[in-house]
Amino acid sequence: MTEVQKSMALFSGSVNPELAEEIAKDLNVSLGNVKLEKFANGEIYARYQESVRGADVFLVQSVCSGAGYDVNDALMELLIMVDAAKRASARSVSAVVAHYGYARQDRKAAPREPITAKLVADLMAASGVDNVITIDPVSYTHLR
């Protein structure tokens, strides 16, 4: 195991675990264990089942609908996972996002409209994301 592999921790959100498994296989690392729950009232819970202290944490989570989550739930799960990693003393947290929800809302087309893509980026930064890595999952599978 290389030094990079020792200091790296890779986790999957609920939306695209298959992609996370492919990335883990390609990097020759194991996916970390994180407990993710969605309560009956819609609230999301995340708890790392292993230490991430001092690790460079990579969270694979598409911000789109899938696996019983809508785009907003997927984003909230990512933010909660980031916050949990930061509070558990991760050295850095990178969001690996295969689909960046709200990316099309990147400019104002009319007065009094939000720039929601910027808001999502600001939310990720506020939660503690150090890096955002966007990938095209179709291209990713073709690169292999």
Indicate where each model-derived feature is located.
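A glycine-rich helix N-cap at a beta->alpha junction
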Residues: L119-T134
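Glycine-rich anion/phosphate-binding loops
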Residues: G66-A84, A109-D122
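Short, ordered loop/turn segments at secondary-structure junctions
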Residues: A98-Y100, P137-V138
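Conserved small/polar residues in nucleotide/adenosyl-binding loops
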Residues: T141-R144
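Residue-level signature of catalytic and energy-coupling elements of molecular machines
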Residues: I23, A95, D136
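Residues at the starts of beta-strands that form the adenosine-phosphate
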Residues: S7, D56, R91-V93, D130-N131
